[in-house]
C-alpha cells in the first residue's frame, strides 16, 4: 500500500519503535492517529511529526482495558472516515518465572499484547473489507516464535498474536486486506526497564528501534507476510526442527 495519504493508526507511539515509525510515516505523507501510554512523550512525538507537515492526532490509551481500546478504535474509524493501516505495536513486558507469576499479571499481559490488538483490528476491519483495501500490521516478538526463560506470560501473549495473525491472513486471503507480522529481536526500547519485572536474562547487543520501524515501512509497502527484524529466522527454524534440543 502507498503510505502517502493513507490514514494510519499506530499504537505504542509515545516511545521506541512506535515513535520512530510515526516520524517515518509522517515524512512519507501519512495521516496519523497515535496512541500511547505517556501523554508528555506522545505530545513530543506529535510535534516532531507535524514538522513534516503531517496531519496528526493523538490519544493517551491504556491497552490493559480492551473494551476501551475497541471503543476508541471505532471512534477513530468513524472520525477519519476509515483506517487504511493499523499498526498494533504497543506491548507490555512480563519477566517473571511461572512459579512466581500471578493470575493478574498473566491476565494483564494477555490483555495488552493480544486481546487489545485483536479487538482494535476487529473494530476497523469491517471498514477495510467494505473498501476492499487495508493493511493490518501486528508487531509480535521473537518470543512469539521461540520461548524465552522467565517470560512465560509474555511469550504466551506473543505466540497468540502470531497465531492470530496467521489465521487472519488466511481468512482475508481473497480480499483486498493484507496482514503483516513483524518479529523483532532484542531492541533498545524502554521495555527492558519497565518497573514490576524481574531482571532480563538477555545480555547481548540491542538493535536500535529504527531497525524495526524501517522494516515496518517495507512491510506496509511490500507483499511479504512475515518480517524478522533483525533476521533471526534461522534460530526459530532450528527450534521448530528440534524443540528438544532448543529447550
What is each residue range found by the language model?
Residues 28-45:
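Conserved glycine-rich Rossmann-like NAD(P)H-binding loop of the short-chain dehydrogenase/reductase
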Residues 121, 157:
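Active-site helix of classical SDR
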Residues 14-16:
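Conserved glycine-rich cofactor-binding loop
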